[in-house]
Amino acid sequence: MPPKKQAQAGGSKKAEQKKKEKIIEDKTFGLKNKKGAKQQKFIKAVTHQVKFGQQNPRQVAQSEAEKKLKKDDKKKELQELNELFKPVVAAQKISKGADPKSVVCAFFKQGQCTKGDKCKFSHDLTLERKCEKRSVYIDARDEELEKDTMDNWDEKKLEEVVNKKHGEAEKKKPKTQIVCRHFLEAIENNKYGWFWVCPGGGDNCMYRHALPPGFVLKKDKKKEEKEDEISLEDLIERERSALGPNVTKITLESFLAWKKRKRQEKIDKLEQDMERRKADFKAGKALVISGREVFEFRPELVNDDDEEADDTRYIQGTGGDEVDDSVGVNDIDLSLYVPRDVEETGITVASLERFSTYASDKDENKLSEASGGLAENGERSDLDEDSGGGGQENGSIDAVPVDENLFTGEDLDELEEELNTLDLEE
């Protein structure tokens, strides 16, 4: 007799599965109904450990994915076999009194019906979808309303929805012209729809749920403002044309006089601020002052600090290993900082006619202006001026007339003295 087969050590698969479930139930006793994250995490870890042992979670997920792929491959293989060999289709049976034309032919589905128009069953494959039973628990209109969102609406559609949704409720409310802010926020944020409910009380909200005539949404206002913005070039041209012809030409003398005046104004302002802060400090009003201001307001503190300071002196020693790096020092040449007049040869100046004829926005005109050529607004190039002879003499350019008596001899002397005594620290 052949030897008996040895019994499996672990028993059948069902027995092993029952053992694992029993172990999981014992270890997680009283924790299944707990909703805490820690308890659920512990239950998941215990289940994974009992079922798969010490396997890596990635390996487990990979094995499950492989099983799923095998099932899909089997289904595809079965479908291919059915298409190739076309298994025998059982004869159709219908209940008494039923119309055969309301049932799709099973042989026609498999492509095996040879009766054609004589077949008593229907050959319309869309018949099943048309005759599908409607569930008494589902309203098809709800699905249509869910798909009909505010993103696809225009103004007319929005008014129609508002009237249908809030029309009857608006009639029962007390008369008020104030629009509900929740309603406006929902429309502005594209949250309004068929299922929107007012947080201020639903249909019992006392404010209006309708847009007043002519109301413009904020998002539409932003679009209009962006369209009304002008370019930087147009803004510069408008501001330049608004100056007019009666302006002072900027020369070296006028610029230096303006600079001197501004510097003096700055010094006067600083002195006034210092006097005011000093008065506040003496009166005890200044709460926040710097250490420098304290010694400026009370110079006697400097001597007190010197008397109380330590008499220890520190001498900086030089080690023998240190190398004396001789660095060349150059004196400052003040002549390099003397302002000089800019050479005006080759500089194009716009004529006074530009204020009467506004420059066109054509690209060709802008290109000619940038290159210094002929333009419609009255600008002239150096070649035209040289050929005409009337616009430029000896490198000087005709522009706005300058008052020669603007600076007297005394002003020029003061200016020269200031340049000679120029302090570089300023």
Curated annotation (Swiss-Prot):
Role according to the record: Protects DRG1 from proteolytic degradation. Stimulates DRG1 GTPase activity likely by increasing the affinity for the potassium ions.
Coiled coil stretches, renumbered: 61-86, 218-285
SUPFAM superfamilies documented for this protein: CCCH zinc finger (SSF90229)
UniProt keyword rRNA-binding, yes or no: no
Zn finger (C3H1-type) location: 99-126, 174-212
Tissue-by-tissue expression: Ubiquitously expressed.
Record's protein name: Zinc finger CCCH domain-containing protein 15
